[in-house]
A protein has these predicted regions:
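C-terminal catalytic domain of Rieske-type non-heme iron oxygenases
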Residues: 1-228
Length: 228
């Protein structure tokens, strides 16, 4: 499927490297768009591995610990965990991403997400393999809604487009939870500068034809709280 965004492509990439946004956008301000577990604000960790960037959010949901990993491989490959198959209430080992997508710039103010929905035992249920299902997985809400409804219950599309067609980073006030955004933006700037100097950007595989290992996923472990 494809989703067209009326904003710069970096704004869409920012969302994937801001794993805490799921707690506020998808679990609190707009109500429960996926599951109650998303509303929990977890412990964040970020990892930089070559041109791969991972944002890990570890939440406690009752007797379970839910580790969700968002993934960006530069310049534009993104994945996260599942949207509906994992809710932090049952054991799950390396459940795979609900979508695999390329975020492609059209111009400074527009971009397109070219995406594949992943359905089955390790992805989301087949019942979501519909146009509306893919939109809910991608943005938290279906996208063809009245303006008033989109303002009351915004999804990812409203969040990334709501900053305007192209944001000025100079006026931002980034927080510790935005560390993933900081490090990947810094790397993109360096790669652009190197490309202008004639240096080809690095590739995610060691040599042409190698399988690229990806890490977007959910793991849920039963770890009851200890009585202290």
């Amino acid at each position: 499927y494809r989703i067209e965004y009326n904003c710069n492509w970096i704004q869409v990439l920012d969302a994937i490297m801001d794993p805490v946004h799921t707690s506020f956008l998808h679990g609190q301000s707009s109500g429960i768009q996926f599951s109650k577990g998303f509303a929990e604000v977890g412990e964040l960790e970020f990892f930089e591995r070559g041109v791969q960037y991972l944002g890990c959010n570890t939440r406690r949901v009752d007797d379970y610990v839910w580790i969700r990993v968002n993934e960006l491989i530069l310049p534009n490959f993104t994945q996260a965990g599942s949207a509906f198959a994992a809710d932090g209430t049952k054991t799950r080992y390396f459940g795979r991403s609900s979508f695999t997508r390329w975020v492609v710039p059209v111009d400074d103010n527009h971009c397109i997400a070219l995406a594949w929905g992943n359905f089955g035992e390790r992805g989301d249920p087949m019942e979501y393999n519909t146009k509306e299902g893919c939109e809910r997985i991608e943005s938290g809400e279906i996208m063809d809604r009245p303006w008033e409804e989109r303002q009351k219950r915004p999804g990812d599309a409203e969040a990334v487009e709501g900053m305007g067609p192209i944001t000025a980073h100079k006026g931002e006030h980034l927080m510790p939870t935005d560390y993933g955004i900081m490090i990947y933006r810094r790397r993109i700037r360096k790669l652009i500068k190197s490309l202008k100097e004639g240096k080809e950007p690095p590739q995610p595989q060691n040599k042409k034809g190698d399988t690229i290992k990806t890490n977007g996923q959910d793991t849920v472990l039963r770890v009851p709280k200890r009585n202290i």
